[in-house]
Amino acid sequence: MSDISKQMNNLSVNDGANTVNNNNSFRGGRSQYVPPHLRNRQGGGNQSGSSSESSDVPFGGSQRGGFNSNGFNNNRGGFNNGGYNNNRGGFNNGGFNNRGNYNQSFGGRGGRGGFNNGGGRYQRPTPGVGKWQDGKHEPAPRNEKLEVELFGTADDSHFQSSGINFDNYDDIPVEASGDKVPEPITSFTAPPLDELLVENIQLSRFTKPTPVQKYSVPIVAAGRDLMACAQTGSGKTGGFLFPVLSESYMKGPAPVPESNGAFSSHKVYPTILVMAPTRELVSQIYEESKKFSYRSWVRACVVYGGADIGQQMRNMDRGCDLLVATPGRLKDLLDRGKVSLANIRYLVLDEADRMLDMGFEPQIRYIVEECDMPAVKDRQTLMFSATFPRDIQMLARDFLKDYVFLSVGRVGSTSENITQKILYVEDDEKKSVILDLLSANENGLTIVFTETKRMADNLADYLYDQGFPATAIHGDRSQYEREKALAAFKNGAAPILVATAVAARGLDIPNVSHVINYDLPSDIDDYVHRIGRTGRAGNVGIATAFFNRNNKNVVKGLIELLSEANQEVPDFLTKIAREGAFGKMTRGGGRGGSSRGPSRDFRRSGNSGWGNSGNSGWGNSGNASSSGWGGNSSSSYSNTNSNYGGGYNNNQRSNFSSGGSYGNQTGSNSWW
């Protein structure tokens, strides 16, 4: 054979027939052309008579070095570690919030670049996504694979439901005030809940409602607004997700307004809006909403700062009926014309007091009052938090109508499921003491709280050097780094998490058995929320705090909390509290211990201490310019203490917290 014949044979389009196996699923029959520059490459189209990759790779999946229907080597920097997967166009449901993830395979509409290969007219049914058709809710068929990913298995410790003390919640006092408060439910049944939601609750292995859930379900079903104060870890997330999803399943989506403008077809019209202060909290709420919206017509989305806004917008294009957002990122999307709030039926503010403390009041007021959101009378508003100080309640009147005030347990207090230990430890002895604590408690997960980001990094490095696998999260770490750290913590690869206040509020991480306040916060409310990371959902936990005279500003609040939770009060705390000089400092540092969340509805408080407001206007939903604060209530929050309202507008991040808990969160845009 001549040389030219040999070369032509090498270039034969039939070379490797019946052996090419790429993402186009070619397995035999007609030969497929393989470009010369890809021939004889490892992972390429021709493997000398053998297939290039396993035929089990799902459609759109990544093959390192191979080529698929979307082009050569579609792994766009794909990283797979502990469940995080950045494979764009993949079908891996194990990731956090990426393209090719759950938004595509579960919550998607078959949008651009997704499962339907380019957003064509034909849309293959998406697993786990139901529809609303002809005025009727049609749930999707069950999907065993999705159910394992969403709900885990009965013996999976990462899917914690209730603990050994869950029945004790029946003994917690509940106060519900307002006109004609609906009777609470006693179990998850249909009715009053939608049948599909009850099935999803059962898949989550929740056997009975917590006190806040017992009341929130009938309150929302009756069309009432709700302000709920409940112990941390008492099921507040389910307290708003259960009722709003149940009502949405029964009522269906609102009709989308007629398109106005060239880009209106790309605008999303969510029915439910949930706002929370941090990206960790909104991500957690989003993960829970995926469980309880499984098989329904409701598709959940999450948006927050510090992540690619373009990718978040593309995720929204696939369907956005329930939007979980931080105020800053939501305002950005509203300004871009990507989101319309015209169809909002349910507005939820979670950790409302913290959002205001962090300076989010201007954004929240803009979103609620200046955009196209329905008026107070045309929507239902729910506010949830573990604390509602008096000034926060007064501000909340602008967003609520004829609401029920729900106080569950000791509002602003801690759970008796948490054993609290206060140790007197000088600063230079803390590292030695924490090693002793960690050595004695090797089971479960431990969260260690510090006041500064530098200390968080230093302590995590120190513990790692001492043989304790530790990782850290704080405001200076990127979103990817924080997700990776949280994943390592949850799966036990790094069972010690060193964190600043960024992780103190709202995160529900199963199996946290020990919380250590390496640095005590200057605000007693922050202490409450930190230790609330353990003892959740009726489980028991231990909270240890290192105290010395640098923490004297919270001594009074600590004694109150320990006494209320039937915990031992150390003698050194009592001694320091009796020293008269320290009593004044409690009022100066943070909110101290004297202004923790109220347990009573202040609509009952009459004229005591409220200037000229009395009861007039407090029960109403009038605007903030009423005379409730001597004619200046609209500026009371921003001007009475410039450490709160004024901080954000001047971009002085260090002014967010009078006590300094958030003062060290420089550049905190990364976690809005």
Curated annotation (Swiss-Prot):
GO molecular function, one term: translation initiation factor activity
Entry EC number(s): 3.6.4.13
Limits of the Helicase ATP-binding domain: 217-406
Domain of life from the UniProt record: Eukaryota
Main localization category: cytoplasm
Domain Helicase C-terminal: residue ranges: 417-577
SUPFAM superfamilies linked to this entry: P-loop containing nucleoside triphosphate hydrolases
Positions in coiled-coil regions: none
UniProt feature, compositional bias: Polar residues: 1-13, 652-672
Motif (Q motif): 186-214
Leading EC class: hydrolase
Gene3D superfamilies named among the record's database cross-references: P-loop containing nucleotide triphosphate hydrolases (3.40.50.300)
Sequence positions that bind ATP: A230, Q231, T232, G233, S234, G235, K236, T237
InterPro entries: DEAD/DEAH_box_helicase_dom, Helicase_ATP-bd, Helicase_C-like, P-loop_NTPase, RNA-helicase_DEAD-box_CS, RNA_helicase_DEAD_Q_motif
Family: Belongs to the DEAD box helicase family. DDX3/DED1 subfamily.
Name of the protein: ATP-dependent RNA helicase DED1
Record lineage: Eukaryota, Fungi, Dikarya, Ascomycota, Saccharomycotina
GN (gene name): DED1
